[in-house]
Regions:
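N-terminal secretory signal peptides
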Residues: 1-27
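C-terminal segment of N-terminal export signals and the immediately downstream linker at the start
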Residues: 8-9, 46-79, 83-86
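N-terminal export leaders
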Residues: 26-44
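Alpha-helical scaffold segments that form or flank carboxylate-/histidine-based iron centers
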Residues: 58-68, 93-112, 131-144, 170-182
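Secondary-structure edge/capping motif, primarily at the C-terminal ends of alpha-helices
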Residues: 82-90, 128-129, 154-165
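Conserved alpha-helical segments that form or flank metal/cofactor-binding pockets of metalloenzymes
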Residues: 101-126, 149
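Acidic/histidine-rich alpha-helical segments that form the ligand environment
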Residues: 145-163, 169-200
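Preference for long, well-ordered alpha-helical segments
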Residues: 188-237
Length: 254
């Protein structure tokens, strides 16, 4: 089982209560496909049955990075949906679930995705390639650092499992600025940085880095970090009443 952090903290207790057998889940660089069921059959949505492993497709390094962004965006959505409640009824906010979300963002997003992949392999190569895209890297690094500061703030004010009245408005403001920053940050990476990085590599280099990223993930988490992160954010959404995708369907225009 994945270990996002050590030491028996709230996240570790959370994981222990929600352990799911992962023997039939593919590696991070494989999507399982079987007829019409497709990749969504991987025990991600309730009621879906895990697919056969008879037909597997490789997942490239860039797709890996963008899927990881998908996990982080789901954390951002949790934070964004919490802001109105912090304004109106902070006592009713589940601080423990928010703490788990911040811990997931720290462990999976900041310590793994940002430090081990982007800052070690992607940004240096983009800088080396030069051009206008390379100039964006400094801003992205600054945002990484600011994000870590905000995450530590969130972890601090949510560590007791409830939100103190005095912390409600500062936390709401932190969520608003954090979400806005990372929405723009990840969008630029997906549409500018990752394509530039891919174009700077040969096909063999890209394949080698994809394998290296998987090795880093296994060393960091002891298993499939992406699949476990998807489970964790799903459980956090469930705890906060945000698991039903249909509730976010926009109403018709009037």
């Amino acid at each position: 089982m994945l270990a996002f952090g050590e030491g028996g903290g709230p996240l570790e207790d959370f994981l222990g209560r929600n352990a799911i057998v992962t023997a039939m889940i593919p590696s991070r660089r494989q999507l399982m496909t079987s007829g019409s069921a497709g990749a969504l059959g991987v025990a991600v949505l309730p009621g879906l049955v895990a697919c056969s492993r008879s037909d597997e497709k490789d997942v490239g390094a860039v797709e890996d990075l963008m899927r990881e962004h998908g996990v982080l965006r789901r954390v951002l959505l949790v934070f964004a949906e919490t802001v109105p409640k912090l304004h109106s009824a902070p006592d009713a906010v589940d601080g423990a679930a928010l703490n788990k979300g911040a811990k997931l963002f720290h462990d999976f997003g900041e310590e793994y995705h940002e430090r081990k992949l982007e800052e070690t392999y992607i940004f240096p190569r983009v800088r080396k390639a030069g051009g206008e895209v390379a100039a964006v890297v400094d801003t992205l690094l600054e945002q990484h650092q600011r994000g870590r500061e905000i995450t530590q703030f969130v972890l601090g004010v949510t560590k007791k499992g409830r939100i103190a009245t005095a912390d409600a408005e500062p936390l709401a403001r932190a969520f608003e600025t954090f979400v806005l920053m990372y929405q723009n940050h990840t969008a630029r990476e997906d549409t500018i940085i990752f394509p530039a990085w891919k174009n700077a590599l040969t096909g063999s280099e890209l394949d080698e880095l994809g394998d290296k990223f998987e090795d880093i993930e296994k060393a960091q988490f002891g298993g499939d970090g992406f699949e476990e992160a998807v489970k964790q954010i799903g459980n956090i959404e469930q705890a906060l009443g945000l698991a039903d995708l249909a509730q976010f369907t926009a109403p018709p225009p009037r």
